[in-house]
């Protein structure tokens, strides 16, 4: 591979003759060598018109060359020098709607970075290839591609042993296989293109680095150790999206019964039911299964994953059930199997026997056994979820560390290598000793400091492999000493201010482009290094949560387990103190960054922003899950804490999200708890008005079925009208979270008084001004070059206390000249928002400044006409204040979609127009072949369906995640049928003997309510609101399918 400092040698592919000649003329302005040839030569940069499988394109990928777009030449020629290639490389950005796969889009970048990282000479450097192709132009082209990738191409007659690939046409492959001339595998000709552009890169280079890496890779066998390599951003983004989609799919399908599942239940009841009754139930179950498969194939498909992970857990559940039965039998309340209708207690127990139970039964012993089983169910469900997220198994730490202290001689050697900037040799020495010694923090910090200064760009990937192997071999939960080691390691090597400060600096540098805590290189690769460090941090925290979940799942005595060891999560987010409060300062900051990163992700297709958003949501999910696991173990009612604190906080912070953005945001959480409580908080804000008894109760299955489901059924009648209280006429609404700030700043809006008079006044004013507007605009455009002092005086990035920029202020004051000058400045953002969320276009529409609106629409094609605050768009602002002419301008640009937008009170823009004539004129601009009334009726119906769909999505998230978290599957129903009756006895005992500690049994109460709700679910389904059955939405249908599957499980077991 060529060094980036050498002279540029350029080749082109895929261009038509005219375009190619134009690019060649631009190359004459730059210092380079252009090779005009149809064959691939040893170039340094290939300029490709499009993604393809041409000889040059494949050869450049195989050789790890820069494969760039034509913009690289155009922009470099304008600058008079060669620019940095990174942002012009094919694979820098992945297009979602492209007909090319993400692997093909990212192939040039992936291969270049992989070969640069490993030091391999080419993609085929270990291949010994025999080509069985007719000698023609095509075979010559194949040879050039193979030789570019450093393959050893051998003639068929001189074929020695050790051939790795035989490439031939399909017909030749069959003939040669019959003759058995070659023992190597055969491949078709198109395999080369598929290997380079469509296949994942197989990382077999690590064995060349050092003996330690050989051992390490043999243990892993290609699995992800827990820390992704620094591959192309496109590949990372594709993997990120697949993780999210697979996670959401697995979580969404918890109630589908597989053959293995049903067999477990039938075997469990074999000693209770007679053979005749068992066969009857089996036939009934098979019939239901056929019907279920016919209707819901997609939902049933992913439940197979769950049965594999829970197979071992079922055996433990059976043992726990036997323990509970033995306790009951010991007390004389275990009936004969022929008389039993359920495994634990009979629901129809007489009142006289209830008194005997209260007198004779050891309630404390049974209560503890039940709580122990409930804990196991919860922790097993969480362990299964984490195993589904990451396919690699929990590592076994069987590597023996001879001595935690490095030999002094080796330590001095590596220090001298680093000081002499022999980084490759220093990293190789560390790698070779890593299996037997823990690398000293000082050495890792010394290398990291040079990585941050961009001095080790070529070998930075190997450094992160050392960190990855360190986490695999010596995790922080291995011992308290290792925890201290990681806390010392994960901090800035220069400032040494601690792990949280380092995490904050990394996030801010990636999210806001803020300066590092000390002076570092400003190269673009430094930002990638910061993101890679965040990946390591994320894998570190996720590993801790997985370890805690597995430990709690394996624990056998619920009364004796005490999680005493600390964790990095504990030290960073709760400063090592008591975790009674969830929302500490670090957690609050992480919440704000996560929400902000999601907003930025929704605005662009930048792979870097998407990857950063994924990491932040993952870190937040790990922190929340850790806090919840510890809280449940300590008997804390985490449901009430989460619902009151976290869910409400996030729902307020996401006030300006659209329903689609909220769906994506909720599904992006890896934590089922986060999904559930954020969905509930948004549902309450959307559908409930004011504080009610329903709002104050913690989330439960009973609350979802008895309270939220009927409310959802009435949404087609009430819509979203309950979201906020009515406001005064024409007064702008504002976010509740911003209202206090606006009152403090004295923000007042210009309001219309006496609407009919104002309409006539504005119409007369606008009609006269519009005639002169074009001429005046042209004059101002010509004179703006003569006003440099005006530009100097205006700092368009500066904001006042209300968050208003110079754009906001000139639109409020109708200063058209200054507006034109500002819009001509580079980097100006016409969609910038103040503290309340208003844009400059909002201000111009609200104040009736028609000329400003005209200039914005004319000069800013990127202006967002659908931007809103509590649903108030610029069109709402204009028409609510009587500015009809501005409304016409907006509709000419935005079309009928603007008329379909509703504010928080459910009002459409035309609802503000009282004059029928004005309303007809505004409606006519959209060229809709319909009447205003019919259009509004259709819009109303569509709006209610959207609201119902979004409500169904939120309710589905609550229901599926709640049942997943508390493991409300069929075996639970079978084993704990009598829990409701038993819990009444326990609560009665608690009221007498443990009144002060009644809150510690909140889990028993939750499970008792769950069973009670599940038993009446079939009757609830028969009385579902009609609109839920007729709504065609996907989320509504998914909600109904989930409820029906739950109901079917209960019916089969009754």
Curated annotation (Swiss-Prot):
Keyword Lipid biosynthesis: no
A family per Pfam: Ank_2
Effect of deleting the gene: Mice develop normally, display no pathological abnormalities and are fertile.
A GO term for molecular function: protein-containing complex binding
Locations listed in the record: Nucleus; Cytoplasm; Cytoplasm, Cytoskeleton, Microtubule organizing center, Centrosome
Tissue and organ distribution: Widely expressed. Expressed in testis. Expressed in spermatocytes.
Example of a GO biological process term: DNA repair
Annotated SMART domains: ANK, BRCT
Keyword Membrane among UniProt keywords: no
Domain BRCT: 2-80, 121-199
GO cellular component, one term: cytoplasm
Chain spans, region NSE5-like domain: 407-1054
Main location as per UniProt: nucleus
Segments annotated as ANK repeats: 802-832, 836-865, 870-900
Annotated InterPro entries: Ankyrin_rpt (IPR002110), Ankyrin_rpt-contain_sf (IPR036770), BRCT_dom (IPR001357), BRCT_dom_sf (IPR036420), BRCT_SLF1 (IPR049935), Slf1 (IPR042479)
Bias kind Basic and acidic residues: ranges: 284-299
Assembly and oligomerization: Interacts (via BRCT domains) with RAD18 (via C-terminus and phosphorylated form); this interaction is required for efficient repair of UV-induced DNA damage. Interacts (via N-terminus) with SLF2; this interaction links RAD18 to the SMC5-SMC6 complex. Interacts (via BRCT domains) with RAD18; this interaction occurs in a SLF2-independent manner. Interacts with SMC6.
Protein name (record): SMC5-SMC6 complex localization factor protein 1
Species name: Mus musculus (Mouse)
């Amino acid at each position: 591979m060529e060094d980036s400092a050498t002279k540029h040698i350029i080749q082109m592919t895929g261009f038509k003759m005219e375009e190619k000649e134009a690019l060649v003329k631009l190359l004459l302005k730059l210092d380079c060598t252009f090779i005009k040839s149809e064959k691939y030569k040893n170039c340094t940069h290939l300029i490709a018109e499009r993604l393809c499988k041409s000889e040059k394109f494949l050869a450049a990928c195989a050789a790890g060359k820069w494969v760039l777009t034509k913009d690289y030449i155009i922009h470099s020629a304008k600058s008079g020098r060669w620019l940095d290639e990174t942002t012009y490389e094919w694979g820098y950005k992945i297009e979602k709607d492209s007909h090319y796969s993400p692997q093909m889009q990212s192939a040039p970048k992936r291969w270049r970075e992989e070969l640069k990282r490993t030091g391999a000479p080419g993609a085929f450097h270990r291949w010994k290839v025999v080509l069985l192709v007719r000698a023609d132009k095509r075979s010559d082209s194949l040879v050039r591609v193979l030789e570019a990738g450093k393959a050893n191409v051998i003639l068929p007659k001189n074929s020695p042993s050790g051939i790795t690939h035989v490439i031939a046409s399909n017909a030749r492959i069959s003939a040669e296989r019959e003759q058995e001339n070659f023992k190597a595998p055969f491949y078709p000709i198109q395999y080369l293109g598929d290997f380079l552009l469509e296949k994942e890169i197989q990382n077999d280079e690590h064995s060349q680095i050092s003996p330690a890496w050989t051992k390490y890779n043999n243990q892993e066998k290609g699995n992800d150790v827990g820390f992704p390599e620094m591959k192309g951003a496109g590949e990372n983004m594709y993997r990120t999206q697949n993780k999210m989609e697979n996670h959401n799919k697995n979580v969404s399908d918890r109630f589908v019964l597989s053959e293995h599942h049903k067999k477990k239940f039938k075997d469990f009841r074999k000693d209770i039911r007679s053979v005749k009754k068992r066969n009857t139930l089996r036939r009934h179950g098979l019939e239901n299964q056929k019907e279920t498969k016919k209707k819901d194939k997609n939902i049933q498909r992913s439940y197979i994953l769950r049965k594999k992970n829970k197979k071992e857990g079922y055996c433990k559940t059976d043992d726990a059930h036997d323990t509970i039965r033995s306790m009951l039998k010991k007390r004389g309340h275990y009936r004969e199997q022929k008389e039993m209708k359920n495994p634990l207690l009979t629901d129809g127990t007489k009142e006289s026997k209830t008194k005997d139970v209260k007198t004779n039964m050891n309630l404390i012993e049974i209560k503890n056994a039940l709580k122990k089983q409930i804990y196991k169910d919860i922790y097993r469900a969480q362990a299964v979820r984490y195993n589904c997220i990451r396919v690699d198994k929990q590592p076994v730490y069987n590597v023996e560390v001879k001595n935690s202290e490095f030999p002094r001689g080796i330590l001095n050697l590596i220090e001298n290598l680093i000081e002499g900037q022999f980084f490759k040799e220093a990293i190789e020495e560390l790698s070779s000793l890593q299996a037997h010694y823990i690398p000293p923090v000082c050495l890792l910090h010394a290398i990291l400091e040079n990585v941050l200064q961009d001095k080790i760009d070529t070998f930075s990937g190997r450094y992160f492999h050392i960190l990855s192997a360190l986490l695999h071999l010596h995790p922080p939960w291995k011992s308290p000493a290792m925890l201290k080691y990681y806390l010392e390691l994960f901090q800035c090597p220069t400032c040494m201010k601690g792990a949280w400060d380092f995490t904050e600096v990394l996030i801010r540098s990636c999210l806001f482009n803020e300066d590092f805590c000390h002076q570092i290189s400003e190269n673009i690769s430094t930002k990638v290094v910061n993101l890679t460090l965040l990946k390591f941090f994320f894998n570190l925290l996720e590993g801790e949560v997985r370890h805690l979940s597995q430990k709690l799942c394996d624990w056998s005595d619920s009364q004796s387990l005490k999680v005493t060891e600390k964790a990095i999560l504990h030290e960073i987010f709760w400063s090592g103190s008591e975790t009674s409060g969830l929302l500490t300062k670090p957690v609050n900051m992480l919440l704000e960054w996560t929400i902000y990163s999601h907003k930025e992700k929704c605005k662009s297709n930048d792979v870097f922003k998407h990857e950063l958003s994924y990491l932040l949501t993952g870190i937040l999910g790990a922190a929340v899950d850790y806090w919840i696991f510890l809280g449940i173990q300590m008997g804390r009612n985490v449901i009430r804490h989460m619902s009151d604190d976290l869910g409400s906080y996030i729902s307020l912070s996401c006030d300006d999200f659209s329903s689609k953005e909220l769906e994506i945001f909720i599904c992006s959480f890896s934590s089922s708890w986060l999904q559930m409580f954020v969905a509930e908080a948004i549902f309450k804000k959307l559908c409930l008005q004011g504080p009610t008894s329903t709002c104050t109760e913690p989330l439960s299955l009973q609350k979802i079925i008895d309270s939220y489901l009927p409310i959802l059924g009435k949404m087609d009648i009430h819509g979203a009208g309950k979201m906020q209280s009515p406001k005064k006429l024409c007064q702008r609404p504002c976010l509740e979270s911003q209202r206090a700030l606006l009152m403090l700043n004295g923000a007042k809006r210009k309001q219309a008084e006496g609407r009919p008079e104002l309409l006539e006044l504005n119409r007369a004013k606008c009609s006269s001004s519009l005639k002169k507007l074009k001429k005046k605009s042209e004059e101002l455009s010509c004179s703006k070059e003569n006003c440099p002092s005006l530009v100097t005086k205006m700092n368009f990035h500066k904001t006042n206390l209300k968050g208003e920029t110079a754009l906001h202020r000139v639109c409020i004051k109708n200063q058209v000249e200054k507006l034109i000058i500002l819009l001509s400045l580079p980097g100006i953002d016409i969609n910038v928002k103040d503290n309340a969320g208003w844009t400059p276009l909002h201000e111009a529409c609200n104040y009736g400044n028609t000329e400003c609106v005209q200039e914005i629409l004319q000069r800013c094609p990127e202006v967002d006409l659908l931007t809103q605050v509590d649903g108030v768009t610029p069109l709402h602002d204009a028409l609510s204040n009587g500015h009809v002419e501005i409304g016409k301008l907006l509709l000419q640009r935005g079309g009928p979609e603007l008329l379909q937008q509703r504010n928080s009170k459910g009002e459409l823009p035309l609802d503000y127009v009282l004059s029928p004539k004005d309303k007809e004129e505004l409606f006519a601009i959209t060229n809709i072949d319909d009447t205003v009334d019919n259009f509004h009726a259709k819009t109303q119906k569509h709006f209610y369906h959207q609201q119902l769909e979004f409500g169904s999505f939120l309710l589905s998230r609550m229901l599926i995640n709640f049942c997943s978290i508390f493991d409300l599957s069929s075996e639970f129903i079978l084993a704990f049928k009598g829990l409701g009756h038993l819990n009444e006895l326990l609560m009665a005992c608690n009221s007498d003997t443990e009144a002060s500690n009644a809150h510690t049994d909140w889990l028993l109460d939750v499970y008792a309510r769950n069973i009670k709700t599940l038993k009446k679910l079939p009757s609830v389904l028969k009385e579902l609101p009609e609109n839920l059955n007729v709504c065609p939405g996907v989320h509504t249908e998914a909600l109904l399918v989930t409820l029906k599957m739950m109901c079917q499980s209960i019916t089969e077991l009754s």
